[in-house]
Amino acid sequence: EAIAQSSGVNAEAAGYLAQVKARANMEGKDVSTIASELQRLGKQAFIEECWKERLREFPLEMKIWDDCVRTGKFPQISATNKGEVQFVDLIGAKNGSGATFKATDLYWPIPVNEIQRNPNLTQNEGYSAK
């Protein structure tokens, strides 16, 4: 993803992703075939393919939230089309429990000692100021 973000979709970026995809290759394709297919993708489609692969590779690693915050996108997995994922804007998206993400969900609490040192600071919404 980083290579594609900075240099566009090229052989290096496609090669790395192809190696990962080839390990669980269900279609019997070799790395060079997968890399060739990936190189034909546009930049955004390639980046989203990287995100999809992270979802498949690290489902229980709790990495998804960091990716959502970093990209501003949330993966919506289709309930009807197996394996289909769409990336929608994080703010306004609904999670699996039906809660809607708000901008304030992206804030961390301000440490209490910082608030004590600076009375002009107020705690971020959703956190109690002690």
What does each of the following model-derived ranges do?
Residues 1-20:
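C-terminal substrate/ligand-recognition segments
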Residues 27-31:
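Boundary/linker segments of alpha-helical solenoid repeat arrays
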Residues 21, 35-130:
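Long, intrinsically disordered, low-complexity segments
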